[in-house]
Amino acid sequence: MQTTHSNPSSPSLTLGIETSCDETGIALYHSEKGLIAHTLYSQIKLHAEYGGVVPELASRDHIRKITPLIQETLKKGQVSAKDITGIAYTAGPGLMGALLSGASVARSLAFAWQIPAIAIHHMEGHLLAPMLEETQPEFPFVCLLVSGGHTMIIRVDGIGRYKLLGDTLDDAAGEAFDKTAKMLGLGYPGGPEVSKLALHGQTDRYKFPRPMVDRPGLDMSFSGLKTFTLNTWLKAKESGDDSEQTKADICRAFEVAVADTLSIKCKRALEQEGLNRLVVSGGVSANREIRAKLDALMAKRKGSAFYPRLEFCTDNGAMIAYAGSKRLEAGQFSDLNFACQPRWDLESLEPIDPIEVV
């Protein structure tokens, strides 16, 4: 990444491209007007019959969808290609083929249109997604990033100023949701199916463990909870009780255990850092139970919790366009010899001055 540009004095319009996994997201973010258009195509139906994302199919579908979605987004925003001043694209973490699908289009368009492009960390996009809302969190804050591939607690002092406080040692929370759904024979994607069934579950029938809350620190683990869930289900089936109500009760116990664990860890992080603002982002941040637990935590602390709107909890182009816009405004851009990173340390990102961010 290079930083030789000075901050532009005129308004900018950034095209954001997100293709890290199984959603193709395109958006336009204006430096003064904010988000002016976004489109999203989900590959859920494509992967449903396989019970999970097939990387090769995901890459091919991104290639088919990117250009039409860009055209649709430009039409929605009532702008033309010549109005775009920069392009932001997800360069990692994610599926390599999917990342390259978006990055190659982004770099090609930037070269053809003679405008800068910037590689964006997928999880930075999620972290900053609440900045798209009318009420934005002020720096510094603690952020819980919770998704299918990540569960991290981070101190955020500005864009690019990230300190990892806690991480999962094995499964991410979203991955545990998906695997629980598969154990119980629920549909795809699994997380929303578990949450839907949990609404009908009895709260007190099962008591699941809250992993790693009995020891100091902010790291997390969800593989043991997943195994406990499986054993509970197998015992129920052995006793002849494999009813939908039993499934619902197990889903409820599992969901509450995850929510409690995340709440306890966030409370510790806020106390440790002396902060009272909590940002919760990523696909799992849409979960009702998790939001309820964290809202209750912040209400008790007389603090504030911030979330993206539901449509921006999952992968989307808007969060990439926003993050890219802020970095491009700070004079950062990526050179033509781009590289995607299926694994990418969030703490390694270059910071921009928080004073420059509104």
Curated annotation (Swiss-Prot):
<comment type="function">
    <text>Required for the formation of a threonylcarbamoyl group on adenosine at position 37 (t(6)A37) in tRNAs that read codons beginning with adenine. Is involved in the transfer of the threonylcarbamoyl moiety of threonylcarbamoyl-AMP (TC-AMP) to the N6 group of A37, together with TsaE and TsaB. TsaD likely plays a direct catalytic role in this reaction.</text>
</comment>
<dbReference type="InterPro" id="IPR017861">
    <property type="entry name" value="KAE1/TsaD"/>
</dbReference>
<keyword id="KW-0963">Cytoplasm</keyword>
<dbReference type="InterPro" id="IPR043129">
    <property type="entry name" value="ATPase_NBD"/>
</dbReference>
<dbReference type="Pfam" id="PF00814">
    <property type="entry name" value="TsaD"/>
</dbReference>
<keyword id="KW-0808">Transferase</keyword>
<keyword id="KW-0012">Acyltransferase</keyword>
<feature type="binding site">
    <location>
        <position position="122"/>
    </location>
    <ligand>
        <name>Fe cation</name>
    </ligand>
</feature>
<keyword id="KW-0819">tRNA processing</keyword>
<feature type="binding site">
    <location>
        <position position="178"/>
    </location>
    <ligand>
        <name>substrate</name>
    </ligand>
</feature>
<comment type="similarity">
    <text>Belongs to the KAE1 / TsaD family.</text>
</comment>
<dbReference type="GO" id="GO:0061711">
    <property type="term" value="F:N(6)-L-threonylcarbamoyladenine synthase activity"/>
</dbReference>
<dbReference type="InterPro" id="IPR022450">
    <property type="entry name" value="TsaD"/>
</dbReference>
<dbReference type="InterPro" id="IPR000905">
    <property type="entry name" value="Gcp-like_dom"/>
</dbReference>
<feature type="binding site">
    <location>
        <position position="315"/>
    </location>
    <ligand>
        <name>Fe cation</name>
    </ligand>
</feature>
<dbReference type="GO" id="GO:0005506">
    <property type="term" value="F:iron ion binding"/>
</dbReference>
<feature type="binding site">
    <location>
        <position position="287"/>
    </location>
    <ligand>
        <name>substrate</name>
    </ligand>
</feature>
<protein>
    <recommendedName>
        <fullName>tRNA N6-adenosine threonylcarbamoyltransferase</fullName>
        <ecNumber>2.3.1.234</ecNumber>
    </recommendedName>
</protein>
<feature type="binding site">
    <location>
        <begin position="145"/>
        <end position="149"/>
    </location>
    <ligand>
        <name>substrate</name>
    </ligand>
</feature>
<dbReference type="InterPro" id="IPR017860">
    <property type="entry name" value="Peptidase_M22_CS"/>
</dbReference>
<dbReference type="GO" id="GO:0005737">
    <property type="term" value="C:cytoplasm"/>
</dbReference>
<keyword id="KW-0479">Metal-binding</keyword>
<feature type="binding site">
    <location>
        <position position="126"/>
    </location>
    <ligand>
        <name>Fe cation</name>
    </ligand>
</feature>
<feature type="binding site">
    <location>
        <position position="191"/>
    </location>
    <ligand>
        <name>substrate</name>
    </ligand>
</feature>
<dbReference type="GO" id="GO:0002949">
    <property type="term" value="P:tRNA threonylcarbamoyladenosine modification"/>
</dbReference>
<keyword id="KW-0408">Iron</keyword>
